[in-house]
Amino acid sequence: MSAIRYELIKTDKQTGARLGKIHTPHGTFDTPMFMPVGTLATVKTMSPEELKAMGAGIILSNTYHLWLRPGEELIREAGGLHKFMNWDQPILTDSGGFQVFSLSKMRDIKEEGVHFRNHLNGDKLFLSPEKAIQIQNALGSDIMMSFDECPPYPASHEYMKKSVERTSRWAERGLKAHERPEDQGLFGIVQGGAYEDLRAQSAKDLVSLDFPGYSIGGLSVGEPKDVMNRVLEHTTPLLPANKPRYLMGVGSPDSLIDGVIRGVDMFDCVLPTRIARNGTCMTSSGRLVIKNAKFTHDFRPIDENCDCYTCKNYSRAYIRHLIRCEETFGIRLTTYHNLHFLLNLMKQVRSAIMEDRLADFREEFFEQYGFNRPDAKNF
């Protein structure tokens, strides 16, 4: 029996978007869901209790980084990632593939795996489909990812075709290496860039392997938003309706809503935490850069429509002062706000699906946020 089970609760009559639940060994979370990223077994500056309070039903950790520091065997010795970081709800781990291809400029892709350099100290390393699964088995995450090749954007059709074929072979090898299928659900990752025929081939290959869930990778890597939406419209109908669909690396408010409309259940991105560290905030009326001089004497909250801890207690002027002085508390406040904003947005999206009005909600949100303006500022 699979460790992961998807339960469809409702389909939005306006858009076809899905409202559901995903059941895991460490509990159930609602979908659509945004997953905060805890790269090194922590969501930067946030405690597990704060994440739970703001509605994070699942978080993500990074296989590549945890393999290098502190090492998967130490985490296994601690009783697994949940005990190590004191998080008793679901955890998803990526395969490390994206980091191998994005952080290491020196890499050699072979059929057996990838030879590359440690981005911290230059040491030679090797990661294979089997090794990526072994590390994740040691970490003990609820949802694991297959090891995939992450081609650059743009890439030629010829290169992408070879990459998709290799990713399919690697997915099959990873599935065979998986030692804990009753405890951990392994997802296959659909690749293929912007080429619809290759996306179809990738989806067909992976669906034939009967994974408990499917990820859509290789998007949000520099392609225009309309290309991403076109690829999603083509790809999600090719995936089983009774299993979860996860769009990797997407976290801007507009892309979350548009992804849900196109049948996606799960999202993750470092965006809300990364931009928070330089003082960029998501608000109901658009992007706000707290360092700007115009906020020096502004004693309003970051977002007057937000009820998060930050907005209930602190002013723009105070947070601007903290960020300009590089005080950690300022980063905590902006991080808390941005994560709360996205998690609350997904809560609103779920309510809109329940009420069969997601298309109306999108129109209202885009209008208020300013996405419909020609000078719209996105992330």
Curated annotation (Swiss-Prot):
Name the positions where substrate binds.
D94, S95, G96, G97, F98, D148, Q191, G218
Matching entries from Pfam families are given as: TGT
Kindly give the InterPro entries that the UniProt entry links to this protein. Answer: ArchSynthase1/Queuine_TRR, TGT, TGT-like_sf, tRNA_ribo_trans-like
Tell me a Gene Ontology molecular-function term this record carries: metal ion binding
Sorted UniProt keywords: Glycosyltransferase, Metal-binding, Queuosine biosynthesis, Transferase, tRNA processing, Zinc
Q: How does it assemble?
A: Homodimer. Within each dimer, one monomer is responsible for RNA recognition and catalysis, while the other monomer binds to the replacement base PreQ1.
Quote the function comment for this protein. Answer: Catalyzes the base-exchange of a guanine (G) residue with the queuine precursor 7-aminomethyl-7-deazaguanine (PreQ1) at position 34 (anticodon wobble position) in tRNAs with GU(N) anticodons (tRNA-Asp, -Asn, -His and -Tyr). Catalysis occurs through a double-displacement mechanism. The nucleophile active site attacks the C1' of nucleotide 34 to detach the guanine base from the RNA, forming a covalent enzyme-RNA intermediate. The proton acceptor active site deprotonates the incoming PreQ1, allowing a nucleophilic attack on the C1' of the ribose to form the product.
Q: What is this protein called?
A: Queuine tRNA-ribosyltransferase
Record the organism. Answer: Listeria innocua serovar 6a (strain ATCC BAA-680 / CLIP 11262)
Q: Which gene holds the coding sequence for this protein?
A: tgt
